[in-house]
Amino acid sequence: MAGTLVNHIPWQLSGIGSGTLGQYNPTDLDYDYAIGGIPFVSGIKDENPYTERMAPIRKEQFDNFAEPGEQSLDGWWLRSQSTFTGGAGVLYQDPDNDNQFNYRFADSLGVDPWEAGNLTLLRRSIEVTSTTNPLPLVRGYVDPTGVDSYWRADGNNLVKHTQAGSTSIVAAGASIASLSSSGARYLFARSDGVFFGLDTAAPTQLTNSALTSPVVEAVKDRIIVTSANSVYQLTYASVGALPAAVYTHQDPSWRWRSITDGPTSIYIAGDSGTTSQIHKFAVVDEAGLPVLRWTGVTATMPAGEIIRTIYSYIGTFIGIATNKGFRVGEIDGNGDILYGPLLFEPTFGCTGIVGNDRFMWVGSQEAHDGDTGLFRVDLGNQTQEQTTRAVRYAYARDIYGEGEFSGGVTSVTMFGASDRKVFAVAFGGFYREQATELLPTGYLKTGRIRFNTEEPKLYKFFSVRMPNALDGSIAISGLTEGGGEIPYITYSGAASSGTKDVATSQPVGPQNWFALKFTLERDDSDSSLGPSLNGWQVKALPGSIRQRILTVPVLLFDNEKDRAYQSYGYEGFARERLEQFKALARAGDSLLFQEINDNLVTEVIIDDWEFRQDGPPAPAGSLGGILTMVLRTTAEST
């Protein structure tokens, strides 16, 4: 067939411009290559070589981030953290508009993240006494001699506790249903009335009326007590029957649950079993004279969410513990409550709130890896949810009773004027935070480190920063997307981590995400000493299968010869193929690149191309020269 001139194009172009890959079906002509169904003969010469190379995977970019940092570094993909004060709840340790990844983490237990740049163990809580009571209560105060103290109500018993010991106050009568205080004066309510007393003195009865589900609280220099669906105001001089109700809810099944106050109002939360609300009561009338007057409902919970405890703090914030979890509200200038979303949602909800410094603590049930304890909320640290952008406050799990899973926290208070907490657990016990003894162990888990992309990554190294000499130890392990935990290294004693990289030999191969877990253990000989973690860093590389760049020169003339020296073509043949090729390149879609003689087919996109005609046009004006295609593979396999 040598020397035969073929005057028609013997191929079919499949899918040009239709979004398909395009494939050339071989005919009698012996071509070398085809791209998108257009066949070509090789134009390889010394000056026009065929080349293959790896495609770059790191783009050159201008860094206009406000702060210098990891995004400015070349080579490694880096993620690091040097403070943990943003609290728990982050899913991905990835940058966003407010860069929460810099200071938040996924979860923790038994550790204190609230000092910037320093993660330590929390103090231990010990059981002072056990209880079989479903509603144990505690209330902290400073006694008349200046000693940090708290009252413990356990059934029909009322007991004063100090660090040195305890003193029984009441040991008979009906079970105490509600406990409050005003300074060193206690108040409690039970089914046969309301009682008060100073420190450890025997109680005096304020009212002898029978009470149903009573709640008592000393607020705004008043004694507020509820019974069934009614609200009453008492004074220390009003011994006897209950006075007329200040307010009675129209629903006879309504029950009041908790009382607190704000700068200008008293708030009482209650529910009918399905609907739960916070009612506002004014404490002065229009003339500025003292009064207690119902002014309306200031907050209504979503259907099915029942308030258990409300707690006002520093005249601005109001904690709302419900059967669904915990919310933080704010009191506006009119005394109305604006509450936010649920910060966290333990399985059994929350009960009991106390505030100190910039924090609130709220009780939970079996939310500390099966044990019962407290959550801490940082009122001075607002964050926004990564997905919904809802405003939230930083939080984390806090102190807990080790091995305590009998019931939920029913009450929490401060131990006098100290920074130590005391909490009561239904059917369990009364727990007091220790002054110096630390928990034996605790951990922190980072969010999922995925570098803001679903592309696979190769996680190669991590490093940690901690003091040169550790009191105790820190063990680091990796958490994988398959749910596994891989132990890496433990630092202890005088072993300093410095900034040395630790290789992560596992997990093997590309991963979508990776996380670290830091387990802190206190000193073996001194329970008041424990390790500190100051920061961490992870190094990774892109794990995508590398693309190839192919540079392929082909002939583009009106009349050509194939590999078998068979002539083919016609006038305008080069122009026609060039225009077809340019249409494919402009479309930018993936195409099939065929190396016909080797029977290889590769999916590619056209990255670039150049047509070069070294000589002047033929007499007929037709073009002819070398077309150099720069192709990038798109569907490589391992």
Show which residues each predicted segment covers.
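N-terminal beta-propeller domains
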Residues: A2-I169, S178-R185, A189-A202, R222, ...
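Non-cytosolic beta-sandwich-type ligand-binding/adhesion modules
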Residues: I9-S14, L21-Y31, G36-K45, T51-A55, ...
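Surface loop/turn motifs at the tips and blade-to-blade linkers of beta-strand repeat domains
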Residues: I126-N133, I169-A174, Q205-L211, V246-S253, ...
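Surface-exposed loop/edge segments in extracytoplasmic proteins
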Residues: T167-I169, T204, L242, I337-G340, ...
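Exposed aromatic-hydrophobic patches
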Residues: W294, G340, T410-T413, S497-P507
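Blade-level signature of beta-propeller repeat domains, shared across WD40, Kelch, NHL, RCC1
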Residues: S406-K445
